[in-house]
Amino acid sequence: MDHRELWPYGLRVLVIDDDCSYLSVMEDLLLKCSYKVTTYKNVREAVPFILDNPQIVDLVISDAFFPTEDGLLILQEVTSKFGIPTVIMASSGDTNTVMKYVANGAFDFLLKPVRIEELSNIWQHIFRKQMQDHKNNNMVGNLEKPGHPPSILAMARATPATTRSTATEASLAPLENEVRDDMVNYNGEITDIRDLGKSRLTWTTQLHRQFIAAVNHLGEDKAVPKKILGIMKVKHLTREQVASHLQKYRMQLKKSIPTTSKHGATLSSTALDKTQDHPSRSQYFNQDGCMEIMDYSLPRDDLSSGSECMLEELNDYSSEGFQDFRWDSDKQEYGPCFWNF
């Protein structure tokens, strides 16, 4: 494969500096990093170019101090309208100056003379930006829009690891881990109740699984709404909502009538009746139509860990309702308990 096809080769960088000599130095350094470079000597010329060609600019590097212009102008125009990552460079880097630019949207602040090592890794800002876009859109497909170049995320994934330089490989690894973590977080644990996309709270399978895990971790006697909420760590989920769910959960447990199944486990009679009425195993909802149904079981290797066991999700669904494993003191073993709201 031609090395010119590998990312971050061809990263499109626009550089702004009123010092023509240093502007030439920056251009040479960026070209050595295999980036495509466009240079301007002042902000007023650069901004119209960006406004007319936002799709061909991946990153802006701007000098902070101009004789007649404020470097913040480029930040305000570029970051607010197009979200193009902007890096500021300056000869001095006192705390107040750095904070001023970072607070106004700068992705990084480089001290002159800028080292080529810093420029060779400058692509990370574009990578993180597109990773954040991916997280906001909740799907990678939204990043590939007609009329726009392939996303940095897609190009980075398409670059074979064996053809990357050692430096690129080392710096890309933690970022790829962040992407994988985001994917697991999105498809796995719920971290913000607004991610469910509902106007009213819906106790989905995953949310209920986190609730049960918290209850089992605390133990039934110590499971109170405030502590459950602290363990679940779901933004915008209120203590009142957890308290209501906990009350319904405990009421259902009290209403369960022990019945011995063919496997010797303890089941509720209502659960057995529903099993006979609904022999097929597919996705169901409760009577209110607001809960997803799924089976849960404790990992076989963790049965000895009591109430602190975490729940393991099975890849099938049940019409019986939520299945929760409870400790049977008479049998000295765990048995499933089904419950619905």
Curated annotation (Swiss-Prot):
Q: What is this protein called?
A: Two-component response regulator EHD1
Q: Which PROSITE patterns does this UniProt record tie to the protein?
A: HTH_MYB (PS51294), RESPONSE_REGULATORY (PS50110)
Q: Specify the Response regulatory domain's residue ranges.
A: 12-127
What keywords appear on the UniProt entry? Activator, DNA-binding, Flowering, Nucleus, Phosphoprotein, Transcription, Transcription regulation, Two-component regulatory system
Disulfide-bonded cysteines: none
Q: What is its subcellular localisation?
A: Nucleus
Task: Indicate the principal place this protein occupies in or around the cell.
Answer: nucleus
Please name the gene that encodes this protein. EHD1
Q: Which domain of life is it from?
A: Eukaryota
Q: Which GO terms describe its cellular component?
A: nucleus
DNA-binding residues per UniProt? 225-250
Upregulation details from the record are: Daily oscillation and diurnal expression in plants grown in short day (SD) but not in long day (LD) conditions.
**Could you tell me which InterPro entries the record lists for this protein?**
ARR-like, CheY-like_superfamily, Homeodomain-like_sf, Myb_dom, Myb_dom_plants, Response_reg_B-typ_pln, SANT/Myb, Sig_transdc_resp-reg_receiver
